[in-house]
Amino acid sequence: MSTTTLTRREQRAKAQHFIDTLEGTAFPNSKRIYVTGSQHDIRVPMREIQLSPTLIGGSKDNQQFEENEAVPVYDTSGPYGDPEVAINVQQGLAKLRQPWIDARNDSEELDDRSSAYTRERLADDGLDDLRFTGLLTPKRAKAGKRITQLHYARQGIVTPEMEFIAIRENMGRERICSEVLRHQHPGMSFGARLPENITPEFVRDEVAAGRAIIPANINHPESEPMIIGRNFPVKVNANIGNSAVTSSIEEEVEKLVWSTRWGADTVMDLSTGRYIHETREWILRNSPVPIGTVPIYQALEKVNGIAEDLTWEAFRDTLLEQAEQGVDYFTIHAGVLLRYVPMTAKRLTGIVSRGGSIMAKWCLSHHKENFLFEHFREICEICAAYDVSLSLGDGLRPGSIQDANDEAQFSELHTLGELTKIAWEYDVQVMIEGPGHVPMHMIQRNMTEELESCHEAPFYTLGPLTTDIAPGYDHFTSGIGAAMIGWFGCAMLCYVTPKEHLGLPNKEDVKQGLITYKIAAHAADLAKGHPGAQIRDNAMSKARFEFRWEDQFNLALDPFTARAYHDETLPQESGKVAHFCSMCGPKFCSMKISQEVRDYAAAQAIEVGMADMSESFRAKGGEIYLKREEA
């Protein structure tokens, strides 16, 4: 862990340098490949890890090798992972989905921004230096039209987004021929449907049933289509965002790019400080992954941080502002009802959700029902006009092990189920947020309750943390719970960084949180038995047994750390081909001994076979040619 502390000026300058010098970069010995769909502009990016051949024999001067297949893996890095693409953060990413959106002819450009706040910001010349220059003209649905992916799915339409996703979710496993790599243990799926091959029609079916969502605002055409659902591999979200006391636009864009490089499937911008609007524009125009927000945070800024002064009108204006910028999903704490707030009084840690506490305070101060609940149908109308998905927030999630699975938590969950049905009336896509802090033996009930109460809408959880005793290591405590709930059926895991409960994460914290959660998600996929989930593990194990060190580094989730740890003790190039590692040394390496045992067993089998043949030869009189009936 680095102990170097940079000043705010140094941090900002470093981030600016990162942005100014940014270019498409591949991981070591990997290359970007594209799999094309039924039309030329459906080009699905993947990363292909190139492997070295296996030495199978021959002489010192004439060695014989067997090729190892390249391993394709899911890639969230967008254009940032392609060395052939010219990156310019000032201009933003190419608008991948724009032709598909235009071809549907069910949306139209707006003459002016719908949000009064947006109009005010655009009229402020003092913000010119901060503002993203290539602003899009926002679109919304034409009158009487529904433009959500859920609407299309229910109409039986397979969109280009759905075909893109089907190709992406198969992760190129159809390219793998090796039986060794394709071997997979049967999983325990807890009722999930996991087809051997994911088709566009399967994607459509899952979206139509509400079991999966495709977060894809029509005003975020730069995003690469992805899906969140129980019957697909588990996804991971990364949180970024500035605060009133730290971080800049440059640093948040840097964290966005960094997050996608390390595997974030979606990113939530949780900014609460100055220039929220401008920061979000820069993030959206440069994001290849869906962006989520918690609109109540910005609405609170608009009333100077006084929760009691919040109004539906201010919140509605914020929804319009963010929807027209391109936010793909909103976290809405509409399930924090007035009658549930007293249930938290006997908790050890009360209400720990920022959004939940804001709404609870508003309800109590006005002694009125949550205005998000009261105006939920209007929220749905706004979301339907731009295809913004709803992430129904768990404002009453437990903030400590002692408060897990209590009355307040599950009362809110049941209300979220009721709201899900209302959102579906408007063809709005929905996922459900979950806890929190839950000990291991109480985790599965959360998944069971969610499936039953929320009609199998995708579950999206923060961990959960399985113990409260490890500040500084909560990416570990939560990674355990994340792997478990992912196995039970959770569709997306919100990462937790080492700074959880302590401070805002920096770049290295973001990476640590993402690697931890990619491990948890992959472990869950293995346990569920997702077809193809074991390919990379098998490739790694084969490389490990054959002492192909470079391949081991390159197959790792974090090749750089794997290489660095190896090189701490065996830095010489000869260490990259050694048939041992520094832990056991050359005489006690279990892999080396196993290879020797295998070679010895093979030799013994040949020797035994020859002895058996000799015995048979002598028993038959030692004749070279036998009569037919004796043969």
Curated annotation (Swiss-Prot):
Substrate binds at N239, M268, Y297, H333, S353, R354, G355, D394, G395, L396, R397, E433, Y460. Pathway: Cofactor biosynthesis; thiamine diphosphate biosynthesis. InterPro entries: ThiC, ThiC-associated_dom, ThiC/Bza_core_dom, ThiC/BzaA/B. Its cofactor is [4Fe-4S] cluster. It catalyses: 5-amino-1-(5-phospho-beta-D-ribosyl)imidazole + S-adenosyl-L-methionine = 4-amino-2-methyl-5-(phosphooxymethyl)pyrimidine + CO + 5'-deoxyadenosine + formate + L-methionine + 3 H(+). It comes from the Bacteria. One of its GO terms (cellular component) is cytosol. GO terms for molecular function: 4 iron, 4 sulfur cluster binding; carbon-carbon lyase activity; zinc ion binding. Keywords: 4Fe-4S, Iron, Iron-sulfur, Lyase, Metal-binding, S-adenosyl-L-methionine, Thiamine biosynthesis, Zinc. Its EC number is 4.1.99.17. One of its GO terms (biological process) is thiamine diphosphate biosynthetic process. The keyword Lyase applies. Homodimer. Belongs to the ThiC family. Catalyzes the synthesis of the hydroxymethylpyrimidine phosphate (HMP-P) moiety of thiamine from aminoimidazole ribotide (AIR) in a radical S-adenosyl-L-methionine (SAM)-dependent reaction. NCBIfam families: PRK09284.1, PRK13352.1, thiC. This is Phosphomethylpyrimidine synthase. It comes from Salmonella gallinarum (strain 287/91 / NCTC 13346).
